[in-house]
């Protein structure tokens, strides 16, 4: 399971002219689900994403996680993160989970975030989405479990 996380000052996702999720300061999480992923991996990745200390403390050091910083989380499904790009000029998506399994794990991940008392907004699974963000820093990390 893969999360591309970005520290943002704001972010939103729109589907068919409807804003489905919008946050102020916090994390934009682009989430990719791979074939071998399961709930255990989703738990580990959620723990890492929410615990990752990429927000500045009073001394300006990256030392706070999203909850300590008072931020929110916007989770957007992104199957292209599971692509194999090592060969050729066209990505292969054979490493991605089947759509029904990917959706179940995406929803599980979102629910785990919400259980941690963090404001968690979402896109719409498998929809054509427009994502807007202001990357703060920029600060972007690739987390994989």
Curated annotation (Swiss-Prot):
SUPFAM superfamilies: DTD-like
InterPro entries, sorted: Daa-tRNA_deacyls_DTD, DTD-like_sf
Family: Belongs to the DTD family.
GO CC annotation terms, alphabetical: cytoplasm
Catalytic activity annotation: glycyl-tRNA(Ala) + H2O = tRNA(Ala) + glycine + H(+); a D-aminoacyl-tRNA + H2O = a tRNA + a D-alpha-amino acid + H(+)
Subunit description: Homodimer.
Name this protein carries in UniProt: D-aminoacyl-tRNA deacylase
CDD domains: Dtyr_deacylase (cd00563)
Record localization: Cytoplasm
GO biological process assignments: D-amino acid catabolic process
Stated role: An aminoacyl-tRNA editing enzyme that deacylates mischarged D-aminoacyl-tRNAs. Also deacylates mischarged glycyl-tRNA(Ala), protecting cells against glycine mischarging by AlaRS. Acts via tRNA-based rather than protein-based catalysis; rejects L-amino acids rather than detecting D-amino acids in the active site. By recycling D-aminoacyl-tRNA to D-amino acids and free tRNA molecules, this enzyme counteracts the toxicity associated with the formation of D-aminoacyl-tRNA entities in vivo and helps enforce protein L-homochirality.
Cited Gene3D superfamilies: D-tyrosyl-tRNA(Tyr) deacylase (3.50.80.10)
Signal peptide: none
Pfam families per UniProt: Tyr_Deacylase
Gene Ontology MF terms in the entry: D-tyrosyl-tRNA(Tyr) deacylase activity; Gly-tRNA(Ala) deacylase activity; Ser(Gly)-tRNA(Ala) hydrolase activity; tRNA binding
Keywords per UniProt: Cytoplasm, Hydrolase, RNA-binding, tRNA-binding
The EC number(s) this enzyme carries: 3.1.1.96
UniProt motif Gly-cisPro motif, important for rejection of L-amino acids: location: 137-138
Domain statement: A Gly-cisPro motif from one monomer fits into the active site of the other monomer to allow specific chiral rejection of L-amino acids.
């Amino acid at each position: 399971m893969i999360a591309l996380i970005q520290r943002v000052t704001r972010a939103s996702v729109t589907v068919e002219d409807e804003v489905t999720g919008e946050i102020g300061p916090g994390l934009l999480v682009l989430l990719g689900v791979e074939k071998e992923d399961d709930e255990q991996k989703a738990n580990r990745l959620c723990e890492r994403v929410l615990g990752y200390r990429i927000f500045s403390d009073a001394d300006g050091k990256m030392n706070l996680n999203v909850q300590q910083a008072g931020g929110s989380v916007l989770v957007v499904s992104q199957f292209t993160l599971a692509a194999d790009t090592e060969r050729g000029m066209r990505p292969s998506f054979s490493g991605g989970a089947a759509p029904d399994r990917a959706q179940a794990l995406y929803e599980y991940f979102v629910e785990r975030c919400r259980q941690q008392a963090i404001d968690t907004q979402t896109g719409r699974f498998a929809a054509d989405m427009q994502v807007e963000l202001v990357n703060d820093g920029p600060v972007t990390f690739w987390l994989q479990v």
